[in-house]
Amino acid sequence: MDFPCLWLGLLLPLVAALDFNYHHQEGMEAFLKTVAQNYSSITHLHSIGKSVKGRNLWVLVVGRFPKEHRIGIPEFKYVANMHGDETVGRELLLHLIDYLVTSDGKDPEITNLINSTRIHIMPSMNPDGFEAVKKPDCYYSIGRENYNQYDLNRNFPDAFEYNNVSRQPETVAVMKWLKTETFVLSANLHGGALVASYPFDNGVQATGALYSRSLTPDDDVFQYLAHTYASRNPNMKKGDECKNKMNFPNGVTNGYSWYPLQGGMQDYNYIWAQCFEITLELSCCKYPREEKLPSFWNNNKASLIEYIKQVHLGVKGQVFDQNGNPLPDVIVEVQDRKHICPYRTNKYGEYYLLLLPGSYIINVTVSGHDPHLTKVIIPEKSQNFSALKKDILLPFQGQLDSIPVSNPSCPMIPLYRNLPDHSAATKPSLFLFLVSLLHIFFK
């Protein structure tokens, strides 16, 4: 028997195993680099920028083509530890990485997910804040803010009121990152409550603020996404697990209904980055003891995986001219779901629209031409981890040079301030709301 090989075989699982401890910057970097080295065919590790103190903002990409976008494969992301003292999400994402890479080729569900999705994972958006926590606390610790004492979840441009704060390096890095990828779906992991919160976080009368809520044109989809996560977390779905705190029916809330906030990241993603993002509050205690981490992983594992799958909801495709040339930067939206910042095709002419099962009219608009309408019917179940594929051929030859490369209709100003007080686009009908709830129930 070859004893050195035997000992090496026994040792490798121990080296590769990720423990349930809090990983500071050095330990987190070591783990991420080891994963990137050992699973180089399905991972790509890169930094999107640096914190105020010069710490790298690491992102690990997991996918069959991790280093670049492939047409038809949607981009998904998880971001955690935006508040440095909210720590559970940071560790859950490290364990999610470990689970994904070690399950590839063994678990058919995970293998299919990696084949069909490009998954971006940022364990810590605020590494300076995490390192600043000297005494972990359930309620508040120095470290929530970044090194310059800015709350990063109040630091983004706001669509409802002017947010004249100094944009921080971590925020700027994320904003630039969002421009480099065609993100479709995202979640932002926090702590201090147990709830899945969906946009809007801020609001005006036109979005329902008079009714203590602020709803997007895609409210049915957002409610479905939030319920998808919460319903698979045994404690979150109770809605009242955190004592002496607000109760959340079924573990879900509209952000504005909970409490309004200015400059939040999930609203910025939805309005300016064409990315549906919700906020996940994962623990009643912001910085729980390490021995609690295994139970947090067990309670969130199924939710984390199922939520990634939702990037395949709805319809996707490319827009072509009559000669088969893809058309970038053209408006592609669903009739009666107009976004205040119109959603546009990427440089490959691709579009991704998250939609629940049903019948919809897609409206494609190119400057100088009549709108092109296409009817689609979204089936009850996505096929093989893929949204319905619907390419759209426009009956003219595209003049690519005349199509703007940026979106002039979407300056980073309070776009909603100029809306009329009552906008049908931002108030989903009661029928649509009930249909979405029935869909969630039967799912």
Swiss-Prot record:
GO molecular function, one term: zinc ion binding
Organism domain of life: Eukaryota
CDD domains for this protein: M14_CPM, Peptidase_M14NE-CP-C_like
Principal localisation: membrane
Subcellular location: Cell membrane
Cofactor binding note: Binds 1 zinc ion per subunit.
Catalytic activity: Cleavage of C-terminal arginine or lysine residues from polypeptides
Lipid tethering residues (GPI-anchor amidated serine): 423
S-S bridge residues: 138-285, 242-284, 341-410
Family indicated by similarity: Belongs to the peptidase M14 family.
Classification via PANTHER family: CARBOXYPEPTIDASE M, PROTEASE M14 CARBOXYPEPTIDASE
Membrane topology per record: Lipid-anchor; GPI-anchor
Segment forming the signal sequence: 1-17
Organism of derivation: Pongo abelii
UniProt keyword Cytoplasm, yes or no: no
Propiece span(s): 424-443
Keywords: Carboxypeptidase, Cell membrane, Disulfide bond, Glycoprotein, GPI-anchor, Hydrolase, Lipoprotein, Membrane, Metal-binding, Metalloprotease, Protease, Signal, Zinc
Binding site for Zn(2+): 83, 86, 190
Active site residues of this protein: 281 (proton donor/acceptor)
Function comment: Specifically removes C-terminal basic residues (Arg or Lys) from peptides and proteins. It is believed to play important roles in the control of peptide hormone and growth factor activity at the cell surface, and in the membrane-localized degradation of extracellular proteins.
Residues linked to a glycan: 38, 115, 164, 363, 384
EC number: 3.4.17.12
GO biological process: peptide metabolic process; protein processing
UniProt xrefs under PROSITE patterns: CARBOXYPEPT_ZN_1, CARBOXYPEPT_ZN_2, PEPTIDASE_M14
Name this polypeptide is given: Carboxypeptidase M
